[in-house]
UniProtKB/Swiss-Prot annotation:
The keyword Transcription regulation applies. SUPFAM superfamilies: GAF domain-like, Winged helix' DNA-binding domain. GO terms for biological process: negative regulation of DNA-templated transcription. Belongs to the HrcA family. Keywords: Repressor, Stress response, Transcription, Transcription regulation. InterPro entries: GAF-like_dom_sf, HrcA, HrcA_C, WH-like_DNA-bd_sf, WH_DNA-bd_sf, WHTH_transcript_rep_HrcA_IDD. HAMAP family: HrcA (MF_00081). One of its GO terms (molecular function) is DNA binding. Transmembrane segments: none annotated. This is Heat-inducible transcription repressor HrcA. Negative regulator of class I heat shock genes (grpE-dnaK-dnaJ and groELS operons). Prevents heat-shock induction of these operons.
Length: 362
């Protein structure tokens, strides 16, 4: 089911394949302890966990060998060990057993999509799928999808600061798009209201492209009726829509808050802050997810295997989904810390992609 061939992965050491059963079990315990707690684990605890009776000294000898192979390392001055990114990759590819979803988990994903109903947009359904996936995995869920030609319903300008405003675009199918707009100095609130009224009178029922053409024409004809500051607000608003006009794909993210749970140290908080910064770099995320559009099944990127998340030490598990004709039309998945529960998250992402494909197939 899962496809583990990330771009940029350094080939594992040939010695990994030669690990004996004892070494594999000790390594497995180190990884599983890390995935469960995020903390380093020492030889004394490992000797209690493994099925083969070994003294802590014997376990330390094996751990030394694992460290030389690049599978584990000692963080700071800790006596315990953590898996490296190479170690996590080896665990996912060679040792991990991917489980099946429970029936309640399957039903939860299906029910969340079914609750949207056919009257809602594809984006709304994908948003619901992400909300459920994010809740089940306790990570951030993402989807890359084609932009729709939804018809506009309403626009509003919300002042954030004296020279910055939020442009809120609402479409007839319930989509909401926000853009931050830089205002000219001295723009009063009355100009924002007048600009909103001018735009709302002309955009309703039109696509973004249609509205842009209509507004450019109307603005040139009605300049005498509008003061200069209002004209500038309207022109800036139109320009902010044009900013994404050449990109035919959109990124939806749900569950940022999940990444703030279970933080163990300031280092964890710093990694999450870096991940938030990465997620704001939408072009980078879109390019990353786009890699899965030509793949079959689930793709897994661990830490620096993907340059975008190399600083935050994050993992990405993604899968493509298809339309009724079997064409891949988007990608969904989760982004979280490298200690994701891979055995549980991989089948969830795979199943969510299959359910979305079935929904789009009618």
């Amino acid at each position: 089911m899962a496809h583990h061939d990330p771009i940029g992965l350094i080939a594992p050491n040939a010695g990994l394949a030669q690990l004996n059963e004892r070494s594999r079990e000790i390594f497995r315990q180190i990884v599983e302890s890390y995935l469960a707690t995020g903390e380093p684990v020492g030889s004394r605890n490992i000797s209690r966990l493994i099925t083969v009776p070994l003294s802590p000294a014997s376990v330390r000898n094996v751990m030394s060998d694992l460290e030389q192979l690049g599978l584990i390392y000692a963080p700071h001055t800790s006596a315990g060990r953590l898996p490296t990114e190479l170690g996590l990759r080896f665990f996912v590819d060679a040792l991990m057993q991917v489980g099946d979803l429970t029936e309640p988990e399957r039903q939860s994903i299906q029910a969340q999509l079914a609750s949207v109903g056919r009257a809602q947009s594809v984006e709304a359904a994908l948003g619901e799928a992400l909300t459920r996936l994010s809740g089940l995995t306790r990570a951030a869920a993402v989807v890359l999808t084609a932009k729709s030609n939804a018809r506009l319903k309403h626009i509003e300008f919300v002042r954030l600061e004296p020279e910055r405003a939020l442009v809120v675009l609402v479409s007839e199918d319930g989509q909401v798009e926000n853009r931050v707009l830089t205002l000219a100095a001295g723009v009063p609130s009355s100009a924002l209201i007048e600009a909103s009224n001018f735009l709302n009178a002309r955009i309703r029922g039109r696509t973004l492209a249609e509205a842009r053409l209509e507004l450019e024409t109307a603005l040139s004809q009605d300049r005498a009726e509008l003061d200069q500051l209002t004209q500038k607000v309207i022109s800036a608003g139109i320009a902010s829509w044009s900013g994404g006009a050449n990109d035919d794909r959109q990124l939806i993210v749900r569950g940022h808050a999940n990444l703030l749970e279970d933080l163990h140290a300031l280092d964890d908080l710093e990694r999450v802050r870096l991940l938030f910064d990465d997620l704001e770099t939408k072009r980078g995320v879109i390019d990353l997810l786009g890699r899965a559009e030509s793949a079959e099944g689930v793709r897994i990127f661990i830490g620096s295997e993907n340059k975008l998340f190399s600083l935050s030490g994050s993992s990405t598990i993604i899968a493509p989904y298809s339309d009724g004709a079997g064409h891949i039309v988007g990608v969904l998945g989760v982004i979280g810390p490298t200690r994701l529960n891979y055995a549980r998250v991989i089948p969830m992402v795979d199943y969510a992609a299959r359910v979305v494909s079935q929904m789009l197939g009618g």
